[in-house]
Amino acid sequence: YLVKSDSIRNVIVRISAFITAALTLFVTLHYFQDGIALSLPGESVIDSVITVIEIFIAVYIITAGIKNKKYIVSVFAFLQTTLMLWFDYTYKHQIKIGTDIVFDKLSGIMVLIVGVIGSLICLYAVGYMKWYHVQHSEYKARKPFFFAVLFLFLSAMFGLVLSNNLIWMYFCWEVTSLSSYLLIGYTKTEEAKNNSFLALFINLGGGLAFAVAIVIIGIRYNTLELSVLTQLKPEPALLVAVFLLCIAALTKSAQIPFSSWLLGAMVAPTPSSALLHSATMVKAGVYLLIRLAPLLGKTSVGRTVTI
């Protein structure tokens, strides 16, 4: 983001993309069969950092919503952040989390998609953005910002697919919503602004559903681990939480009736759309649905989501 020279930034992007893809292949090939399950040291510190960042994100979105008269976006951001802060300081400290990170075959496949395809898109974007502003001189060039958001997007996706801790997954989930908003609104035209806020509105609605689900699961079942959640016996309260998580997944993956935001995303530069479709947002929603599959079989929630 701080590098203003195109040539230097292009070298950094290429090297970063190569390292990301190489590490992705190494980790996946090395751990794909046996997997990894671990709890990170300093979990409370990480949680505190996440909380602070969530507050900053919420303030940014609320301010942007008010400034652009998209008040429902501000309301959604305020509600979900307030709910999560309340949960953090009232119930969360009572819940012990045994496994924060899980790398199994499913997350391994997702890591490959994010790391390899995402890196290829970043490499493609180097050449694409070189000529984009030549052909569209009416748009202000913000290439440092553009590439910074691309890599922020990939980082959030890695965190999302590797997190067994629902709080961490939720945080990464919301970072992807913010990233998509920033990329879709890149040109700052009226159409781009409207479509970026449409994407933010739908995905923040899903984020609010995600937050409510976390509160239900944490208070009722005293767990915040996705692996533990999927082993619980389906009952009404749990199925309500699962349904809310499915709503979040459907909004993120732009499934009917939440698909309109993805069409609007086409106003962004092509690498943005490629990333949204192939390696980030759409895949995130599908990933969560697959994770929840054990709780969807032979249940009313599963049938409803399928329909």
Tell me what each language-model feature is:
Residues 1-307:
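...captures the hydrophobic TM-helix bundle architecture rather than a specific catalytic motif
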